[in-house]
């Protein structure tokens, strides 16, 4: 068999796997670098957060090996159950959740915490993909069929906003609309939903003083650099110090608790300070290449009528792209802060578990697509 023929029969996406491994490697290095100061302050252990990150990474790898063996047909059949479990977990958060910085988003399992909001993304997208398998024609021809998945998203949004978690709600909203667009819903159906969504976001911002402060500080952070603009000004200072090539790995000053949440929501700022604009550009290029591979895998699955797999893969690509744009946009002062992680790079156990599960689903979808083509060729 010639080399080109051997590549044709490769039954997994090697590019996707290598990109993911690269991003996880960058994430591990940056979490070690950014979390040392806060680790020393909280536990007198500079590697406290690095150890936890490594634990979650190991757990994610084990979970991924299990997930890889589950056929996509099983995910389709279990999508409603996954959504139901997610709804129950979100309710439990409101009843017995742990509060951090005024937000109740975590369930405690001994010394570990899980964030059901992260699971809500994958659960909703699995459910929507399953819904589109059954009701694609109804979505295209009937406004009620279009509104049903929006209703499910709104139910999740209500529970998430009670935590509160507007950032996750925006990810769910944008990705849901994008999936319906890919399902060829009529443009006029989107107009009232988008209008209502914009109005709802404006009202939510007005209703909470801390959200208003985020918007005003985003518009002019230098007006109050030691008050409501403190976080953003320090983020911009980090980018400014990094310039093109950065100060060198480990040489950030802003991570010494000038910039809070340096290892989570604002890790991109420290990445820019230590590795420069070049380092940020490389990391973003890798994330968007992962998203592009997801969309490509989805397109190929749809082409051979694997509808559930195709829509799920596309939703993962849209999710990663939008979340990355919001995270980097907030760190660079182009968007108000939303509390979303930078995929695979920010510290966050629940985020790591869910996003690596999503990657494994992409690999499984691609495997089934390639296998179906190979079997058709053999026949």
From Swiss-Prot:
Residues 1-15, 74-79, 134-139, 184-186, 291-301, 364-379 are cytoplasmic. It catalyses: [GlcNAc-(1->4)-Mur2Ac(oyl-L-Ala-gamma-D-Glu-L-Lys-D-Ala-D-Ala)](n)-di-trans,octa-cis-undecaprenyl diphosphate + beta-D-GlcNAc-(1->4)-Mur2Ac(oyl-L-Ala-gamma-D-Glu-L-Lys-D-Ala-D-Ala)-di-trans,octa-cis-undecaprenyl diphosphate = [GlcNAc-(1->4)-Mur2Ac(oyl-L-Ala-gamma-D-Glu-L-Lys-D-Ala-D-Ala)](n+1)-di-trans,octa-cis-undecaprenyl diphosphate + di-trans,octa-cis-undecaprenyl diphosphate + H(+). GO terms for biological process: cell wall organization; FtsZ-dependent cytokinesis; peptidoglycan biosynthetic process; regulation of cell shape. Pfam families: FTSW_RODA_SPOVE. Keywords: Cell cycle, Cell division, Cell inner membrane, Cell membrane, Cell shape, Cell wall biogenesis/degradation, Glycosyltransferase, Membrane, Peptidoglycan synthesis, Transferase, Transmembrane, Transmembrane helix. It is a multi-pass membrane protein. GO terms for cellular component: cell division site; plasma membrane. It is found in: Cell inner membrane. Residues 37-52, 101-113, 163-165, 208-269, 323-342 are periplasmic. The chain crosses the membrane at residues 16-36, 53-73, 80-100, 114-133, 140-162, 166-183, 187-207, 270-290, 302-322, 343-363. Pathway: Cell wall biogenesis; peptidoglycan biosynthesis. GO terms for molecular function: lipid-linked peptidoglycan transporter activity; peptidoglycan glycosyltransferase activity. Its EC number is 2.4.99.28. Belongs to the SEDS family. FtsW subfamily. Peptidoglycan polymerase that is essential for cell division. This is Probable peptidoglycan glycosyltransferase FtsW. It comes from Moranella endobia (strain PCIT).
């Amino acid at each position: 068999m010639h080399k080109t023929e051997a590549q044709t029969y490769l039954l997994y996406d090697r590019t996707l796997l290598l990109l993911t491994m690269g991003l996880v490697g960058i994430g591990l290095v940056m979490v070690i670098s950014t979390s040392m100061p806060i680790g020393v302050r909280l536990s007198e252990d500079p590697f406290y957060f690095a150890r936890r990150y490594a634990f979650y990474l190991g757990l994610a790898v084990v979970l991924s090996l299990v997930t890889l063996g589950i056929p996509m047909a099983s995910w389709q059949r279990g999508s409603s159950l996954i959504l139901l479990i997610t709804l129950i977990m979100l309710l439990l958060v409101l009843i017995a959740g742990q509060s951090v910085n005024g937000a109740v988003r975590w369930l405690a399992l001994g010394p570990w915490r899980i964030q059901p909001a992260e699971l809500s993304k994958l659960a909703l997208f699995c459910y929507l993909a399953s819904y589109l398998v059954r009701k694609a024609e109804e979505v295209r021809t009937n406004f009620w069929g279009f509104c049903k998945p929006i209703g499910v998203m709104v139910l999740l949004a209500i529970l998430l906003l009670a935590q509160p978690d507007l950032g996750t709600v925006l990810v769910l909203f944008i990705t849901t609309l994008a999936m319906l667009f890919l399902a060829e819903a009529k443009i006029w159906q989107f107009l009232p939903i988008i209008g209502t969504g914009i109005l709802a976001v404006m009202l939510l911002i007005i209703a909470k003083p801390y959200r208003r402060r985020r918007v005003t500080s985003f518009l002019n952070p230098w007006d109050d650099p030691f008050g409501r603009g403190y976080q953003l000004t320090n983020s911009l200072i980090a980018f400014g110090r990094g310039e093109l090539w950065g100060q060198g790995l480990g040489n950030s000053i802003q991570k010494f608790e000038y910039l809070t949440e340096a290892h989570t929501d604002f890790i991109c700022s420290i990445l820019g300070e230590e590795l420069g604009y070049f380092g940020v550009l490389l990391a973003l290029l890798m994330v968007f290449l992962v998203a592009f591979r997801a969309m490509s895998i989805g397109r190929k699955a749809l082409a051979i009528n694997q509808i559930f797999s195709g829509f799920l893969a596309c939703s993962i690509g849209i999710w990663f792209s939008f979340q990355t744009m919001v995270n980097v946009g907030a760190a660079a002062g182009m968007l108000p802060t939303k509390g979303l992680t930078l995929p695979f790079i920010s510290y966050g156990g629940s985020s790591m578990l869910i996003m690596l599960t999503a990657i494994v689903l992409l690999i499984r979808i691609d495997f089934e697509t390639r296998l179906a083509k190979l079997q058709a060729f053999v026949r």
